[in-house]
């Protein structure tokens, strides 16, 4: 099980910046150690356990890049219309049977190995075959044209894939090109997910008139699944300090991370912070971020705990910027910083200094046809699920920014990039 050191970070006073909070969490979590071999067809999205070096040069042999005719560069014609006898034919997957004779050509196809002596290929579109079956070649082709040398892509023994990589389809393809059938990956981390609050009912169960159906839990579980986690749905914990403490302690024994939403603010019925202190240690609480200020992080029996706000937009935003990097660190993944795309603001906005804010926006083509501009969603409430559904992403406004004017360059994070 991933462990978190048991020293408490002194919180209070000014709210902590997002970067400070993430840095503190990063120093206190360690990656899961267990490694498992998975079939290569199941490796997409998993975290590579160790480096992979090229066990085979790519390509493993020198081959033709086009359909055409292979010749010796010493025989390249200096004038138009020189005819060469065709003394062989090599298809992809076949081996060259004999060297190319001086003054001869060999019919060759894309991917076929180059015959001994040949080092240049004429594209079939650039030649013609005369009545005698000879190939008539143009002048001016450079030596080595249209040939892929062995190891052109990757040399034998070269570093290919680095440990900690979150494997993508193209990474899986590279491993397959080396002939691998299995890949060693870190085991999936186990995450327990709770919602908290008497005001919540689970979908499919009776809902009282003053209750809402729980949506955060399913959003968070879906986001965790996209990050490759093994997720335990532990339902809804009621607003009872003792029950919360008991549920958190029980989850800590069998999971690598505990994640809750709701109950981390300062209201009389917000018991999560106190429950964490009853069974563990609170490391930090409250961040300078909007939406999402009430975020709690602690340790319970060595297991990291993160408590997110109950408002769905705040929960979404803080998941992206706090939970996501924590999950990657626990999983043994390389850091994957989010890189905002520069766009032009098509809105006016004012904010407090020293607080990072995220504005929900849609993208559209700029009126002058150059680049994209961000259009602010008309409503700002942190409880508006529709504001996440009906927008393309978030504009990130750093701590130093106090206002945004139309035409100003801002950073955009598309939802597709956030997990």
Each language-model region and where it sits:
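Short, glycine/charged-enriched hinge/interface segments at domain edges or termini
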Residues: 2-16, 69-233, 238, 373, ...
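Structural signal for hydrophobic packing residues in well-ordered secondary-structure cores
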Residues: 26-33, 51, 114, 158-164, ...
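Short, low-complexity N-terminal leaders and the immediately following helix N-cap/first helix
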Residues: 1-79, 333-358
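Flexible glycine/proline-rich
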Residues: 19-22, 36-41, 50, 93, ...
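Helix-rich terminal scaffold detector
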Residues: 1-19, 181-308, 312-318, 329
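Predominant activation on well-ordered alpha-helical scaffold segments within soluble catalytic domains
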Residues: 22, 26, 67, 124-125, ...
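Generic structural signal for well-ordered, non-membrane alpha-helical segments
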Residues: 14, 18-22, 36, 40, ...
């Amino acid at each position: 099980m991933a462990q978190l050191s048991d020293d408490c970070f002194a919180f209070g006073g000014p709210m902590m910046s997002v970067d400070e909070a993430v840095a503190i969490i990063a120093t206190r979590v360690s990656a899961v150690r267990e490694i498992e071999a998975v079939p290569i067809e199941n490796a997409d999205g998993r975290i590579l356990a160790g480096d992979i070096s090229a066990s085979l040069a790519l390509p493993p042999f020198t081959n033709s890049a086009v359909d055409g005719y292979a010749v010796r560069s010493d025989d390249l014609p200096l004038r138009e219309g020189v005819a060469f006898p065709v003394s062989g034919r090599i298809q992809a997957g076949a081996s060259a049977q004999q060297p190319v004779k001086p003054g001869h050509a060999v019919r060759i196809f894309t991917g076929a190995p180059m015959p001994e002596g040949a080092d240049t290929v004429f594209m079939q579109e650039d030649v013609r075959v005369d009545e005698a079956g000879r190939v008539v070649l143009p002048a001016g082709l450079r030596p080595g044209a249209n040939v892929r040398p062995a190891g052109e892509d990757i040399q034998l023994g070269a570093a290919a894939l680095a440990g900690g990589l979150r494997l993508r389809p193209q990474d899986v393809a590279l491993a397959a090109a080396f002939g691998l059938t299995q890949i060693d990956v870190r085991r999936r981390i186990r995450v327990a997910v709770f919602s908290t609050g008497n005001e919540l009912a689970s979908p499919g169960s009776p809902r009282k008139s003053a209750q809402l159906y729980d949506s955060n839990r399913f959003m968070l579980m879906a986001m965790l699944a996209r990050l490759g986690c093994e997720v335990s749905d532990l339902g809804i914990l009621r607003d009872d300090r003792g029950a919360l403490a008991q549920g958190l302690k029980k989850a800590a024994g069998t999971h690598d991370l505990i994640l809750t939403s709701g109950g981390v603010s300062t209201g009389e019925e917000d018991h999560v912070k106190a429950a964490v202190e009853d069974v563990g240690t609170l490391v930090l609480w409250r961040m300078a971020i909007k939406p999402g200020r009430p975020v709690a992080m602690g340790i319970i029996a060595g297991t990291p705990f993160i408590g997110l706000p109950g408002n769905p937009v705040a929960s979404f935003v803080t998941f992206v910027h706090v939970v996501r990097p924590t999950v990657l660190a626990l999983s043994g993944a390389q850091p994957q910083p989010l890189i905002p795309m520069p766009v032009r603001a098509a809105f006016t906005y004012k904010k407090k200094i020293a607080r990072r804010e995220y504005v929900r926006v849609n993208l559209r083509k700029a009126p002058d046809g150059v680049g994209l501009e961000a259009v602010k969603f008309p409503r700002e409430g942190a409880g508006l699920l529709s504001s996440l559904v009906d927008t393309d992403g978030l504009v990130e406004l750093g701590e130093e920014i106090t206002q945004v004017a139309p035409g100003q360059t801002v950073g955009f994070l598309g939802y597709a990039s956030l997990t």
